[in-house]
């Protein structure tokens, strides 16, 4: 995502209008945690809040990190645009009690996202099950904000579609393996297993132990969310990942607009690297932020307050993802999600689901 953000800035000559732009990336992960770290997220947000020269925040990547950062940056009046957060409770009811209000201590919104939220991804996951003839499902999650929240949405949508949820539990992601869990599930003989979580929490080991328990993806589907829509799932999962279905709260590179396809070509030429699912979304978020800064500069002084106002004023934005706006909650008006399946060690696009029509 960092490359995509830097590319957006470089293409404008390091400026937003007549304003010189400086960008500094902040890693929310630590070597000790091996993934995003709550204390590091808080530290990053506090550092930004105290630096008056910072007028905008692109991120974070993980929804759990957003839970920590939003209140800190809200009190600082710093506008946020996330390329990747999908947890429903960050912007609207449907998650835990007092959400989303508890993330906005000032009573004013400062957070936006350019990707579809998990209430719609949960519906897409359940709809996929229905289309595949699934009558029963066992739902697992990694006990984190994103994973548990998404699993909750899938369970709710499955219930509404008449799909029997025969088991639901959070797994110990620090365990060396999940053999006991998978052996137990095998006795229940569901039509599908759904996992709400991220690749860093041993999603690949789950599919390995699923196969080891005699549950092939031909007989018992494995369905996961965009938290495992990463190359690591393919490389770590190997043969066990074959046939797995993945939902994504957006569109893969092959289904982007003509602008999106042009971006992919230019990005891969520039960095000699393939785009990842969130690369285009990071580029979109960066350009929206730069546009907000430019509009603020034309109206007067560029401050956190004026940039935040212009972020929320984003309307009919014609970008890589199509034409869209931010609603009053900070959510994108985009409604398209996608389904991928692992085939021959690659994610292969299957279809687009329009949440607005579900």
Language-model segments: residues:
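Surface-exposed patches in mature extracellular/periplasmic domains of secreted proteins
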Residues: 17-25, 56-61, 138-142, 196, ...
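Extracytoplasmic ligand/sensor domains, especially the bilobed periplasmic-binding protein
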Residues: 51-168, 221-243
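Signal peptide-proximal N-terminal region
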Residues: 2-28, 159-163
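Hydrophobic alpha-helical
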Residues: 63-74, 176, 190-214
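Short, well-structured alpha-helical segments in soluble
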Residues: 34-55, 127, 177-189
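Short beta->alpha junction loops
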Residues: 25-38, 44, 116, 167-177
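Extracellular/periplasmic periplasmic-binding protein-like sensory domains
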Residues: 207-283, 297, 347-349, 353-358
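Segments of small-molecule ligand-sensing domains
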Residues: 269-279, 290-347
């Amino acid at each position: 995502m960092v490359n995509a953000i830097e590319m957006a800035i470089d293409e404008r000559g390091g400026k937003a209008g007549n304003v010189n732009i400086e960008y500094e990336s902040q890693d929310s992960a630590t070597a000790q945690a091996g993934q995003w770290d709550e204390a590091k997220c808080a530290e990053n947000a506090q550092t930004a809040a105290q630096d008056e020269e910072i007028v905008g925040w692109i991120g974070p990547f993980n929804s759990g990190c957003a839970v920590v950062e939003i209140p800190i940056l809200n009190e600082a009046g710093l506008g946020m645009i996330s390329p990747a957060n999908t947890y429903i409770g960050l912007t609207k009811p449907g998650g835990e009690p007092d959400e989303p209000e508890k993330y906005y201590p000032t009573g004013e919104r400062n957070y936006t996202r350019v990707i579809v939220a998990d209430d719609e991804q949960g519906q897409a996951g359940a709809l996929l099950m229905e289309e595949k003839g699934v009558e029963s499902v066992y739902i697992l999650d990694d006990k984190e904000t994103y994973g548990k929240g998404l699993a909750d949405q899938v369970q709710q949508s499955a219930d509404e579609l008449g799909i029997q949820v025969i088991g639901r539990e959070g797994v110990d992601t620090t365990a060396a393996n999940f053999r006991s869990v998978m052996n137990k599930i095998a006795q229940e003989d569901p039509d599908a297993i759904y996992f709400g979580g991220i690749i860093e929490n041993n999603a690949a080991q789950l599919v390995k132990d699923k196969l080891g328990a005699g549950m092939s993806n031909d007989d018992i589907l494995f369905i996961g969310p965009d938290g495992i829509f990463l190359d690591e799932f393919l490389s770590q999962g190997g043969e066990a990942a074959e046939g797995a279905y993945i939902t994504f709260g957006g569109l893969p590179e092959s289904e982007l607009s003509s602008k999106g396809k042009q971006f992919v070509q230019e990005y891969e030429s520039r960095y000699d690297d393939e785009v990842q699912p969130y690369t285009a979304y990071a580029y979109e978020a960066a350009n929206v932020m730069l546009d907000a800064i430019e509009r603020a500069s034309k109206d007067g002084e560029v401050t956190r307050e004026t940039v935040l106002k212009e972020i929320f004023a984003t309307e009919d934005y014609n970008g890589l993802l199509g034409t869209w706006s931010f609603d009053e909650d900070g959510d994108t008006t985009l409604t398209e999600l996608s389904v991928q399946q692992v085939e021959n060690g690659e994610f292969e696009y299957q279809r687009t689901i329009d949440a607005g029509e579900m």
